[in-house]
């Protein structure tokens, strides 16, 4: 516990909150160009081939972004929209690609949670 004199001299220091999506620079989304599309394996208890893409954003920063949903049409030089949101079992992946916008197509035959995957309503 500090003395009053110590508080007069130094004062309390505010806690600094760490930014979870620094590459977006305060924007809700950012456009970018895919430089590499590949698959990675998740951390220990899980096993899969997760689809990810290396994306160069308009802010000039290159990030790794997850491609959600089943199947995708992305390849090198595809223009994508990136949002924040990490993937818990992929270390270093702190961004997600928005399906159904720019060059990214929505998920086919999606019945539930369609808006998250850019899927149109079936007639």
From Swiss-Prot:
MF-aspect GO terms: rRNA binding; structural constituent of ribosome; tRNA binding
Phenotype upon changing residue 86 to H: In strain: KO-150 and KO-151; low level streptomycin resistant mutants which increase antibiotic production
Keywords: Antibiotic resistance, Methylation, Ribonucleoprotein, Ribosomal protein, RNA-binding, rRNA-binding, tRNA-binding
Annotated signal sequence range: none
Biased composition (Basic and acidic residues): 11-20
Gene Ontology annotations for the cellular component aspect, listed alphabetically: ribosome; small ribosomal subunit
Record note on biotechnological use: One streptomycin resistant strain of S.coelicolor and S.lividans (K88E) produces increased quantities of the natural antibiotic actinorhodin; strains which are resistant to multiple drugs produce more antibiotic.
Record SUPFAM superfamilies: Nucleic acid-binding proteins
Example GO biological process: translation
3-methylthioaspartic acid PTM sites in chain numbering: 89
Family recorded in the similarity comment: Belongs to the universal ribosomal protein uS12 family.
Role description: With S4 and S5 plays an important role in translational accuracy.
Protein name: Small ribosomal subunit protein uS12
This protein's encoding gene: rpsL
